[in-house]
A protein has these predicted regions:
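C-terminal helical subdomain
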Residues: 177, 184-185, 192, 201-246
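Residue(s) in the substrate-gating loop at a strand-loop-helix junction
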Residues: 144
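Substrate-binding pocket helix/loop in short-chain dehydrogenase/reductase
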Residues: 99-101, 108-110
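The beta1-alpha1 cofactor-binding region of Rossmann-like NAD(H)/NADP(H)-dependent oxidoreductases
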Residues: 42, 62-73, 106
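Active-site helix of classical SDR
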Residues: 124, 160
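Conserved glycine-rich Rossmann-like NAD(P)H-binding loop of the short-chain dehydrogenase/reductase
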Residues: 30-46
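Conserved glycine-rich cofactor-binding loop
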Residues: 16-18
Length: 246
């Protein structure tokens, strides 16, 4: 039986651990060739080993996403090698400082915005032409409930995810008349290292695993997925539309 994503090229950021790692493996199992991007070489090599064990294939790209020129070079390399991109999963993110806003220095604020917002903006700029070369370009960006909760002491993270959501929804509107479908995925509380750092008193064994969440991202990357500009909430298993105030 032909794998559902056979011959598809999938770019996944933050692929060395957590949801990105699990999503990269799941996409590869579904037949996609995965272009795995992360800062951590060791994590990428471990991912490559697992993908090969599963019978899949991957290209490893050690890249800090604050290297915005590096993202542009990656786009050029993908164009030269594949001529297209079928799937973009913007997963990489950082939590940033957990402090009152008035106590946060400008540098850590900028660091959070660089990874969570600007890197995704640069991915959109550099990968859109490649996604347009696909017969069914699909983009999924990982967000958080923090975008709307305005939780105390998580200001940089919440603000960055709110900005990401507006960025992604805008792109979805701009590409609505094309074959590209653009959506957001909110995993909610998941058993990741970043979650453990922000909530150290939480029992991780009460949380779902990245592998469980990844199984819901894969269908959003399929040519059969027709929705765009939507928000999939993993915790409630609900696909939501955004509503603007009247």
């Amino acid at each position: 039986m032909t794998a559902p994503l056979a011959s598809r090229i999938a770019l996944v950021t933050g692929a060395s651990r957590g949801i990105g790692y699990a999503t990269a493996r799941a996409l590869a199992r579904a037949g996609a060739h995965v272009v795995a991007v992360a800062r951590t070489q060791g994590g990428l090599e471990e991912l490559d080993d697992e993908i090969k064990k599963d019978g899949g294939s991957a290209t490893l790209v050690p890249l800090n996403l604050t290297d915005f020129d590096g993202i542009a070079r990656l786009g050029a390399a993908l164009h030269e090698r594949h001529g297209k991109l079928d799937i973009l999963v913007g997963n990489a993110g950082v939590a940033g400082p957990s402090s009152p806003l008035g106590h946060i220095e400008l540098k850590p604020w900028n660091d959070v915005m660089a990874i969570n917002v600007t890197a995704n903006f640069q991915l959109i700029r550099c990968m859109e032409p490649l996604l347009k070369q696909s017969d069914a370009g699909r983009a999924v960006f990982v967000t958080s409930g923090a975008a709307n909760k305005a939780a105390a002491y998580l200001g940089p993270y919440g603000a960055s995810k709110a900005a990401l959501e507006t960025l992604v929804r805008t792109w979805a509107n701009e590409t609505a008349s094309t074959p590209i479908r653009v959506n957001l995925f909110n995993p909610g509380p998941i058993r990741t290292r970043m979650r453990a750092t922000v909530f150290p008193g939480e029992d991780p064994m009460t949380l779902d695993t990245p592998e469980q969440a990844a199984e819901f991202i894969v269908p959003m990357c399929s040519p059969a997925w027709g929705e765009t500009g939507k928000f999939y909430d993993y915790k409630t298993r609900t696909l939501m539309s955004f509503r603007a105030p009247a």
